[in-house]
């Protein structure tokens, strides 16, 4: 029998038929919807006189456009000041009501960012194919699932047929062996990977993360890593199923029960790459070599360790790369050879589908406890990824830690990850952000984004500039997974 990778196994389990042109019809187990990429898809169903093929395979929640202050949320839909944003959230409510799709509406305790809500509800399960009209759907691959983002026309296609046409990708394995040093996290792993292979390194590949450092990561940490596979150029990121995966899923609302659970676990336990499976590309890193990472430029691959300096374009021989560095330095308002620790900040954002889970908040709170946000920081936001994460954090007293330190404690949503809601950067402002993208204008027109882990973001907030979180001593305990 031919040895298979995890991706091979998931593909074979869901391939309905193979076409003459080399593409395949793939069955989709779970479809997650939000307010931005679904309106036209639902309208397409109406115009064609169709209904969703499998209503129970879909769940929905608004996240991109929702406001995050308590006052705005208490005001309901009318409190959404932007007309387009308000219409999109309202339209999602109406579409889900009309078609009978389960939606966690804006003020439902279960509402949150789609890539946080799916796993915590058990709607994401090992062995599934999972799609959503959002590129960071790769997050769900942390569960040994085949998960990727789709466009609006594909959202309609999945609603109507529960299938998609796709071509099989190549296999890439990223192996991270060893033990992470104190103060180094899952976010640092994935930023280091992107720094090594670049934002095109995974093009055309399904990327499996493996190795002892990945196995040691929590499910939250694995979700962080798979979340940013797309920034490494791969549409799909995944981690093999193990006992941590199964323990996380057990007992969640959508998880199988009783005999169905036992049968599911038996299948899930096979969702690992065979020992002699072939990977088209293998990338290796040593965990011990990874330090806390900070992005300095306008692409996720423009990332350095905290103890390094911003690059000098004059030292770059490749003219294309030299021009890219020069443009990034100009946009970011930085100078060649500037120490990363000399980058001063205006705002701090802890949240997003990358880093807004309970372990992320615990890690940031461990650093913030007993400290104060620096007087030079205009705003430091903490935005939980869901209402359930928020409730758990409050039960643990994390909200009080943040509030005492001078952070703002918000309601769940995508928030400052992207400029589609009231939480935005002003032009020229530097932000330490736990999100996943640092393109020009991503967090607001002219805004300057630096990608970091939650612990590094909290350390920057209390310092006013980037610092090595490892130098803050025992406060860094427990930050490894985030």
From Swiss-Prot:
Pathways per UniProt: Amino-acid biosynthesis; L-leucine biosynthesis; L-leucine from 3-methyl-2-oxobutanoate: step 2/4
Keyword 4Fe-4S: yes
UniProt EC number: 4.2.1.33
Stretches the record annotates as Disordered: 60-79
Residues the record lists as binding [4Fe-4S] cluster: 353, 414, 417
Family from the record: Belongs to the aconitase/IPM isomerase family. LeuC type 1 subfamily.
Role according to the record: Catalyzes the isomerization between 2-isopropylmalate and 3-isopropylmalate, via the formation of 2-isopropylmaleate.
Protein name, per record: 3-isopropylmalate dehydratase large subunit
Source organism of the structure: Xanthomonas euvesicatoria pv. vesicatoria (strain 85-10)
Lineage summary: Bacteria, Pseudomonadati, Pseudomonadota, Gammaproteobacteria, Lysobacterales
């Amino acid at each position: 029998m031919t040895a298979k990778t995890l991706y091979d196994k998931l593909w074979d389990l869901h391939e309905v038929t193979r076409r003459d042109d080399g593409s395949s019809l793939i069955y989709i187990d779970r479809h997650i919807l939000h307010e931005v990429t679904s309106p036209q898809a639902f309208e397409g169903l109406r115009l064609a006189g169709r209904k969703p093929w499998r209503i129970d395979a879909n769940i929905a929640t608004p996240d991109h456009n929702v406001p995050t202050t308590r006052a705005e949320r208490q005001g309901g839909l009318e409190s959404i000041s932007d007309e387009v944003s308000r219409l999109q959230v309202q339209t999602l409510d109406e579409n889900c009501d009309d078609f009978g799709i389960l939606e966690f509406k804006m003020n439902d305790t279960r509402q949150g960012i789609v890539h946080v809500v799916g796993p915590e509800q058990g709607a994401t399960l090992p062995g599934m194919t999972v799609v959503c009209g959002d590129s960071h759907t790769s997050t769900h691959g942390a569960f040994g699932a085949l998960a990727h983002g789709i466009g609006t026309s594909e959202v309609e296609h999945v609603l109507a047929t529960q299938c998609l046409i796709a071509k099989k990708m190549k296999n890439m394995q990223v192996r991270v062996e060893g033990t992470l040093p104190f103060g180094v996290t899952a976010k640092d792993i994935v930023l280091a990977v992107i720094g090594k292979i670049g934002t095109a390194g995974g093009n055309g590949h399904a990327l499996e993360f493996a190795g002892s450092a990945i196995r040691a990561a929590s499910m939250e940490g694995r979700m962080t890593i798979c979340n940013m596979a797309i920034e490494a150029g791969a549409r799909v990121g995944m981690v093999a199923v193990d006992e941590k995966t199964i323990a996380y899923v057990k007992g969640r609302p959508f998880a199988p029960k009783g005999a169905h659970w036992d049968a599911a676990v038996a299948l899930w336990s096979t969702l690992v790459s065979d020992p002699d499976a072939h990977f088209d590309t293998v990338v290796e890193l040593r965990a011990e070599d990874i330090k806390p990472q900070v992005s300095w430029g306008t692409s996720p691959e423009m990332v350095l360790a905290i103890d390094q300096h911003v690059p000098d374009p004059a030292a770059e021989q490749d003219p294309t790369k030299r021009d890219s560095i020069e443009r990034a330095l100009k946009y970011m308002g930085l100078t060649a050879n500037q120490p990363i620790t000399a980058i001063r900040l205006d705002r701090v954002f802890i949240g997003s589908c990358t880093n807004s889970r309970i372990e992320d908040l615990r890690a940031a709170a461990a650093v913030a406890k007993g400290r104060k946000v620096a007087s030079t920081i205009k705003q430091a936001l903490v935005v939980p990824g869901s209402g359930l994460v928020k409730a758990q954090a409050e039960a643990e007293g994390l909200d009080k830690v943040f509030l005492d330190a001078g952070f703002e404690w918000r309601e769940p949503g995508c928030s400052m990850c992207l400029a589609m809601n009231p939480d935005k950067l002003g032009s020229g402002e530097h932000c330490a952000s736990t999100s996943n993208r640092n393109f020009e204008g991503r967090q607001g027109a002219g805004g300057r984004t630096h990608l970091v882990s939650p612990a590094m973001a909290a350390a920057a907030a209390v310092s006013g500039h980037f610092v090595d979180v490892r130098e803050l001593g025992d406060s860094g305990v427990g930050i490894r997974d985030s």
